[in-house]
């Protein structure tokens, strides 16, 4: 029987070349928000990491992330919650570097949000069952945080557009909050008059506003709500989940005026005190957003830019109405060219919507 041939390379054979390393994005610079001021190339990718703190009410300096103790009214007409009982949306604007020095070009560069990695920070803090919570058993630990919970975040190139919906249109909300104006019974279902932009942090109560599904073409939002009295919070921790922000055309939110907007609301449930009172508990949210530069058609012709510049320099006057439903303008006349003197000064001549000359006798 012939000897078995040894596996492996023959003596004197040239060694195999090692495989080329995988290509990954080259890190140009890393730091704080001041890094955004560094000019980069057209193909550069920028990553922004930030976090939003919860706005639950914070009744005192020791209860950051908690609301004021809740109290329910006996009927709809007497409902008047206090300001610090109301969890509100958190929002922020992140300024991005200016990409265009010449706004008269046919094409411009805009920042485009491509992906986001996000998670709720501090979920293990809810394992604390020994700090002032109501006991489940006489000699046991405290009651864990439970009840209705809501987790929401949004990333966009402009402020999130909101739709107002109320549980009780007769509720009287306190000063310092922004709620739907002039509510009616229709406000408890769908009233298209209740529109707003999420343009202020800690001002829009979560119970009054939801993202508007008919708008927000330039934003992406995600949220879950779980209702119930004894529902436990279910949250995940991972740095491997990435949410793609591109639409079906492969385009992500375009950051208008070089501004990126992030919003969040993370209500984990109700904390039950030893006295039996309850408070909302909220946590912060972390964002890691990847942006790239996209070439777009210039939507602002030079005539628009000049007109806008001139209009901004015009002095504004808060005067009586001269346009709209209550306009005090009686008549406008337009003269063009000359004609022979008419014999009837009361004859009305005008051009209709079709551009035809019309004559009307009084």
Swiss-Prot record:
<dbReference type="InterPro" id="IPR011222">
    <property type="entry name" value="dsDNA_vir_gr_I_capsid"/>
</dbReference>
<feature type="short sequence motif" description="Bipartite nuclear localization signal">
    <location>
        <begin position="5"/>
        <end position="19"/>
    </location>
</feature>
<keyword id="KW-0597">Phosphoprotein</keyword>
<keyword id="KW-1015">Disulfide bond</keyword>
<keyword id="KW-0945">Host-virus interaction</keyword>
<keyword id="KW-1164">Virus endocytosis by host</keyword>
<keyword id="KW-0946">Virion</keyword>
<keyword id="KW-1162">Viral penetration into host cytoplasm</keyword>
<keyword id="KW-1145">T=7 icosahedral capsid protein</keyword>
<protein>
    <recommendedName>
        <fullName>Major capsid protein VP1</fullName>
    </recommendedName>
</protein>
<dbReference type="GO" id="GO:0042025">
    <property type="term" value="C:host cell nucleus"/>
</dbReference>
<dbReference type="Pfam" id="PF00718">
    <property type="entry name" value="Polyoma_coat"/>
</dbReference>
<keyword id="KW-1166">Caveolin-mediated endocytosis of virus by host</keyword>
<keyword id="KW-1161">Viral attachment to host cell</keyword>
<feature type="region of interest" description="Disordered">
    <location>
        <begin position="1"/>
        <end position="21"/>
    </location>
</feature>
<keyword id="KW-0167">Capsid protein</keyword>
<dbReference type="GO" id="GO:0039620">
    <property type="term" value="C:T=7 icosahedral viral capsid"/>
</dbReference>
<keyword id="KW-0426">Late protein</keyword>
<keyword id="KW-1048">Host nucleus</keyword>
<dbReference type="InterPro" id="IPR036931">
    <property type="entry name" value="Polyomavir_VP1_sf"/>
</dbReference>
<dbReference type="GO" id="GO:0005198">
    <property type="term" value="F:structural molecule activity"/>
</dbReference>
<dbReference type="GO" id="GO:0075513">
    <property type="term" value="P:caveolin-mediated endocytosis of virus by host cell"/>
</dbReference>
<keyword id="KW-1160">Virus entry into host cell</keyword>
<feature type="modified residue" description="Phosphothreonine; by host">
    <location>
        <position position="338"/>
    </location>
</feature>
<comment type="function">
    <text>Forms an icosahedral capsid with a T=7 symmetry and a 50 nm diameter. The capsid is composed of 72 pentamers linked to each other by disulfide bonds and associated with VP2 or VP3 proteins. Interacts with gangliosides GT1b and GD1b containing terminal alpha(2-8)-linked sialic acids on the cell surface to provide virion attachment to target cell. This attachment induces virion internalization predominantly through caveolin-mediated endocytosis and traffics to the endoplasmic reticulum.</text>
</comment>
<comment type="similarity">
    <text>Belongs to the polyomaviruses coat protein VP1 family.</text>
</comment>
<dbReference type="InterPro" id="IPR000662">
    <property type="entry name" value="Capsid_VP1_Polyomavir"/>
</dbReference>
<dbReference type="GO" id="GO:0019062">
    <property type="term" value="P:virion attachment to host cell"/>
</dbReference>
<comment type="subunit">
    <text>Homomultimer; disulfide-linked. The virus capsid is composed of 72 icosahedral units, each one composed of five disulfide-linked copies of VP1. Interacts with minor capsid proteins VP2 and VP3.</text>
</comment>
